[in-house]
Amino acid sequence: MKGNKSHRSGFTLIEIMIVVAIIGLLASIAIPNYAHSRGAAHRAVCINNLQQIDGAMQRWSLEMQKDEGQAVTYGDIRSYLKGSVVCPAGGTSFEDSYTITTVDAPPICQRKPATHKLAP
């Protein structure tokens, strides 16, 4: 007697559900870590930019013999900066990324002032 066995190849519903669950678990671990790493990188770049701006302000004030409290603008220090200085957390230009006021005041990030700041 010959049986009516048909051999089907493929995955069962349970196997597919297990694979989907594993992929979901891996994604739930990887995505928050990626977002945290990206935020930390943005913060590091912005703090480096703030240090460059502060150094440019100090060099400008020494060369121009400006006292503490003297006003400073981006136009004054532009030649002391290398390339464009923009906050990576969403800035498009220096003016919408950073605020500078006086020679003795540190520059401020407009995008994330609470976390993107120079150490005192």
Identify the meaning behind each predicted range:
Residues 17-33:
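Alpha-helical hydrophobic helix detector
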Residues 1-11:
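N-terminal leader/signal peptides at the extreme start of proteins
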Residues 55-120:
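Extracellular/periplasmic head regions of type IV pilus-like filament subunits
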Residues 33-50:
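Aliphatic-rich helix starts adjacent to a transmembrane/signal segment
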Residues 20, 47, 54:
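Conserved catalytic core of two-component sensor histidine kinases
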Residues 12, 16, 51, 55:
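Catalytic phosphate/metal-binding cores of nucleic-acid and nucleotide-processing enzymes, i.e., regions
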Residues 24, 35, 44, 59-62:
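Terminal, compositionally biased segments used for targeting/anchoring and flexible tails
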